[in-house]
């Protein structure tokens, strides 16, 4: 495997600050090489995309160890879209960068600008229902899958995360990084942290897809199931709309920017039908009551009250089972599974900053904190 210096080619773009009071925020694109454990790519050296953002006023070569953060995405949206929306103050990455953090976000295999297995270029590997939207433009009729199961798995995701964490640790000469994760990023980041507590400082988990009864060991891989999936603009909108419970919960202009960035992250998918986002199906296991119960890392967990993808009760279960004495659960009102793109995003961002810098939320190191609900 090539050295980290050779593996991570960086292209630097200067980004204008949103206000005259804020310093310039730099963006650096890295390519990190990993020996893949994805069954379809097993043993191959492949590249993962990592985005970095930091203030031009900061000397990153002398960064404080507790100020290095890595974002980990969920099941569908790549990290650079989820956490770096280029619209007013909606970039979580830029928010933390402005606060003096060196901020990274990674795409695991099959997502965004990271390596995509060839199996994701075959419409026959979609579910029969999703195949319908590509008949007859891409396939003449329904067809059988050409790969035997789900494309990626938690083990391969943990392997990807470890490669990026080690790259960051070597790059910034720190022992630990903090992880911020969304949705399926919960098992990815939380499971990784449980297995590598020596490399993780703190955790922030938004809507973690927790299953306290998850199997402790993986099934034979690849696990039978749909290989990968797509999401169209209409599906993206409908999924968000079903989670709206408050007036003016989000700015419609944000949705336009998010979808634009989503399609830009998948140039091949942009040419499928009216344009889709592609993502691998992922086999999960391991991040269960036993694993999370043994986790002692300080952890902030956030649940959106209107979330219809990872129910608040499921998030509360993760909080209850977590073994760390330093743990806070935020019950975030008027917020969906997409809260970082909604009007309460500023509350989330500020809470994450307080947690990362002080280990508290509103001054508390443990317990449940409500915020974001309409004032009576």
Question: What are the residue ranges of the model-derived segments?
Answer:
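Conserved hydrolase catalytic core segment
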Residues: 171-180, 184-213
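Alpha/beta-hydrolase
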Residues: 143, 213-302, 376
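Conserved alpha/beta-hydrolase "acid-adjacent" motif
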Residues: 308-314
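Catalytic histidine neighborhood in serine/cysteine hydrolases
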Residues: 322-338
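Catalytic histidine-centered segment of alpha/beta-hydrolase-like enzymes
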Residues: 335-347
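Short, surface-exposed "cap/lid" segments of acyl-processing enzymes
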Residues: 57-105, 115-120
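Conserved acidic catalytic loop of the alpha/beta-hydrolase fold
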Residues: 132-148, 152, 158-176
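N-terminal cap/lid segment of alpha/beta-hydrolase-fold proteins
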Residues: 21-64
């Amino acid at each position: 495997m090539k050295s980290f210096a050779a593996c991570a080619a960086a292209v630097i773009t200067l980004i204008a600050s949103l206000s005259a009071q804020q310093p310039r925020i730099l963006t650096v694109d890295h390519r990190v090489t990993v020996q893949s454990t994805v069954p379809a790519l097993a043993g191959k050296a492949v590249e993962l995309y990592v985005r970095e953002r930091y203030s031009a006023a900061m000397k990153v070569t002398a960064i404080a160890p507790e100020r290095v953060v890595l974002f980990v995405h969920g099941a569908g949206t790549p990290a650079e879209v989820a956490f770096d929306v280029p619209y007013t103050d909606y970039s979580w990455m830029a928010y933390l960068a402005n606060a003096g953090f060196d901020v990274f976000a990674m795409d695991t295999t099959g997502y965004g600008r990271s390596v995509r297995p060839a199996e994701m270029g075959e419409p026959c590997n979609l579910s029969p229902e999703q195949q319908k939207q590509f008949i007859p433009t891409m396939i003449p009729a329904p067809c059988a899958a050409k790969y035997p199961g789900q494309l990626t798995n938690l083990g391969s995701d943990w392997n990807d995360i470890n490669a990026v964490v080690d790259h960051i640790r070597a790059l910034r000469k720190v022992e630990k990084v903090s992880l911020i994760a969304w949705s399926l990023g919960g098992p990815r980041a939380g499971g990784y942290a449980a297995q590598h507590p020596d490399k993780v400082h703190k955790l922030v988990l938004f809507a973690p897809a927790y299953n306290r009864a998850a199997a402790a060991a993986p099934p034979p891989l690849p696990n039978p199931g749909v290989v990968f999936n797509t999401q169209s603009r209409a599906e993206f909108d409908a999924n968000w709309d079903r989670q709206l419970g408050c007036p003016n919960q989000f700015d419609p202009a944000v949705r336009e920017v998010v979808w634009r960035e989503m399609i830009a992250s998948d140039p091949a998918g942009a040419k499928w039908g009216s344009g889709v986002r592609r993502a691998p199906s992922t086999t999960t296991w391991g991040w269960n009551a036993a694993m999370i119960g043994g986790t002692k890392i300080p952890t902030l967990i956030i649940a959106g009250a209107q979330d219809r993808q990872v129910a608040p009760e499921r998030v509360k279960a993760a909080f209850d089972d977590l073994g760390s004495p330093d743990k806070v659960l935020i019950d975030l009102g008027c917020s969906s599974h997409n809260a970082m793109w909604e009007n309460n995003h500023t509350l989330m961002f500020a809470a994450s900053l307080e947690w990362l810098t002080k280990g508290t939320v509103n001054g508390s190191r443990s317990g449940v904190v409500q915020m974001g609900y309409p004032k009576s």
